[in-house]
Amino acid sequence: MAPEMDQFYRSTMAIYKSIMEQFNPALENLVYLGNNYLRAFHALSEAAEVYFSAIQKIGEQALQSSTSQILGEILVQMSDTQRHLNSDLEVVVQTFHGDLLQHMEKNTKLDMQFIKDSCQHYEIEYRHRAANLEKCMSELWRMERKRDKNAREMKESVNRLHAQMQAFVSESKRAAELEEKRRYRFLAEKHLLLSNTFLQFLGRARGMLQNRVLLWKEQSEASRSPSRAHSPGLLGPALGPPYPSGRLTPTRLDMPPRPLGEYGSPRSRHGSGSYGPEPAEARSASQLEPDRRSLPRTPSASSLYASSTQRSRSNSFGERLGGGGARRVRALVSHSEGANHTLLRFSAGDVVEVLVPEAQNGWLYGKLEGSSASGWFPEAYVKPVEEIPVNPMNPVAPMNSMAPMSPMNELPSRSYPLRGSHSLDDLLDRPGNPTASSEYWDSQSRSRTPSRVPSRAPSPAPPPLPSSRRSSVGSMGAATDVKKLMSWEQNPPELFPRGTNPFATVKLRPTVTNDRSAPLIR
């Protein structure tokens, strides 16, 4: 047998075996998976029907209320629209079941027998033709050896059989390739029909939802404004905030939806609320009484949520910080979040707004200034930012002579206290009569050597005195304290006044290396 004919035969048999051993089993598995898909969709459709029916009932309840009729109408319309889309989707599933799965299952059963018979017929026919051709070639060889006069006719017969054999193997291979292509085309055309049905469904759904969603959004946003049915007594003054003055914690449902861009940031996800940032009116009410947080040892998402929900009337930022709001600190070193997304990442020099009044086990919770990132960070990584002290006589106007950002008022680096147990800040912050504190300072400066100097950054002025005492001694004490502090800043004392340096008489001996103590190296 010629090598090219044998190659054609092997290729044809490989195609038939591929259809029988790979394509048909894969098609059977596809039918099985499609039936599972149908069952899952029917379960999903039933669950969706129950869900949107429940939404419709809630909307009908809202229609009966006096404040949420518009929202109830929106819920009913949403439920009807989704149920209508669900019924349209069932048409797509029916197409998938009737035009695809049933045909594939039926064709698979028929095709398995057809391909098996075709393969057997081809194999038998090929062997019969090959045996006949081999027999004629043997007879021709015998006649040529005997010089038979019929050898020419036998040779013509062999050539004719060889041509027929070659045409048969070529045609059989083309038929096998065509059968293989028809099966893949059948699968592609059926799924193309399914995709077209999905496209029609999505087009109808888009046309149905495009205008309705915009209308629902406008009506929902309009419902955020106070209702005309409410009396002014319930909402407070006509020009006041939209929330009553007694409401300290706005509900999460009143907050606008979170922008889509915030879902990509893990830190903003942990730092924001469940429903997004608070609106302006809710923020003004919530600042009346901030959090009193009880935190665990290690910050976590649960502790963050717990700290944002616990409130206390007796302990707020306004009472702890004198109404000044959250304090600001500056980062000394960089801090990375690592694998814990509840930690705050910042670089050295960044300013962080502390949202927790006191450190909890060495951790502070704050928000990075200039961004929406918030989280936990070690207290040792930051230092307080110099604040502008407030004049006790006029709490609104700051003291210009104590501005911390002025280079003339900043003390040199050697002005840190070395041996003193108190500083100027301790004396200024001591409660009581400012005159008594100034007299104590005068006596201390005269009786002792000025070995202690004020710290680099002057601390804020002491809290205002009660109204009965502030009227009598406020101006005198404040003026005395300011003068003392200005004199210390302009003429700081020497680090070691003459005769007070304990190391002035110390003389160091020259060191000598004892080479005999070195190891012996051979």
Curated annotation (Swiss-Prot):
Q: Which GO terms describe its biological process?
A: membrane organization; plasma membrane organization
Indicate the impact reported for residue 141 to S.
Deficient in oligomerization (dimerization maintained). Inefficient formation of planar membrane structures. No effect on lipid-binding
Cell membrane keyword on record: yes
**Listed result of changing residue 147 to A:** Impairs lipid-binding activity and hence PtdIns(4,5)P2 clustering
Which positions bear Phosphoserine? 231, 272, 303, 472, 475
> Where, per UniProt, does this protein localize?
Cell membrane; Cell junction; Cytoplasmic vesicle membrane
Effect upon mutating residue 124 to S: Partially impairs lipid-binding activity and hence PtdIns(4,5)P2 clustering
Under the heading SUPFAM superfamilies, the entry gives:
BAR/IMD domain-like (SSF103657), SH3-domain (SSF50044)
Tissue localization of expression is: Expressed in the epithelial layer of the intestine and in the kidney.
Asked if the keyword Cytoplasm belongs to this entry, the reply reads: no
Bias (Pro residues): 457-466
Give the main location: membrane
IMD domain: which residues? 1-239
* Residues of the SH3 domain: 324-387
What topology does it adopt in the membrane? Peripheral membrane protein
**PROSITE patterns assigned to the protein according to its UniProt record, in alphabetical order:** IMD, SH3
Which residues lie in Low complexity bias regions?
A: 443-456
InterPro entries registered for this protein in UniProt: AH/BAR_dom_sf (IPR027267), Baiap2l2_I-BAR_dom (IPR030126), I-BAR_dom (IPR013606), IRSp53/IRTKS/Pinkbar (IPR027681), Pinkbar_SH3 (IPR035593), SH3-like_dom_sf (IPR036028), SH3_domain (IPR001452)
Record's protein name: BAR/IMD domain-containing adapter protein 2-like 2
Species the sequence originates in:
Mus musculus
